[in-house]
Amino acid sequence: MDRRNEDTALLALRGGLRGRFRRSFDSMENAFEVLQDRLQHAVNPAERAELMPLLEELQTQLICLRRLGDQASDAATAALLHGTCVPQPIDLLGQLREFCSILQEEAAQYALPFTVTLQADGLDVLPTTGDVSLLNGLLTNLVSNTLAADRAAHIMLLCTPGRLCYRDNGPGLPPDAAALLTEGQWSERLLHAGGLGLPLLAAYTSAMGWALTVGEGPGMSLQFTLPAAPPLDGMVLTSPTERLADRQNRRRLIRRELAVLVADTSMQ
């Protein structure tokens, strides 16, 4: 199988897995809505008030399961991504500007108090190679991890030629989490806690041909060393339809992460 067919097969696998998960979740959500409607009309106000916390918890878990399904489908193909993903020339700075803009717009809908700053002193563009879908996964996972620790966090994206730094003012990564990111070593604590966020961060980074190191605190500091910048004339211009689809997908991912965050917090 040639490289193009391999890429197509991987995308089909990932899409098929996501579709299968989502059909199951859609069925669960439909059943939940029927249950909610029945309770709305078949019980008295006192019983309804007693059952509402349970319904809210079920709704939260459905949101989390949908997110986990997307992550699991990514994880199922992550081991193959490094050998088959072909990073394309991109303007990383332009991608980051759009990501931050959408993130701020969506955060305003939930009245979340965190801030995000993009610094790229003296740069108009930051040419490198990467993959827009994988970049979306990388950034949304990073933001999700930060906000899970502190909803009022300050996130900083610092761009210099050949390098991207992600920082926040949170508690920072524990040593075993840093070892998982950079060396793939699972500790007993992390195995018990579960989750796919950290290994997916490493997989996205590796698949794009980027290098990841964990910097010193305070807060979390991740340094991404970027591949050599391609010539600007090597940039592939996407059609307006493709750009719109990319933007919509980016917004969907950000909205999902923030919805999970708000739902988790409301149940605490």
Show where each model-derived region lies:
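C-terminal end segment of the histidine kinase catalytic
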Residues: 206-262, 267
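Short conserved segment of the HATPase_c
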Residues: 173-186
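Short beta-strand/loop element within the Bergerat-fold HATPase_c
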Residues: 154-163
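Conserved micro-motifs of the catalytic ATP-binding
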Residues: 80-85, 125-130
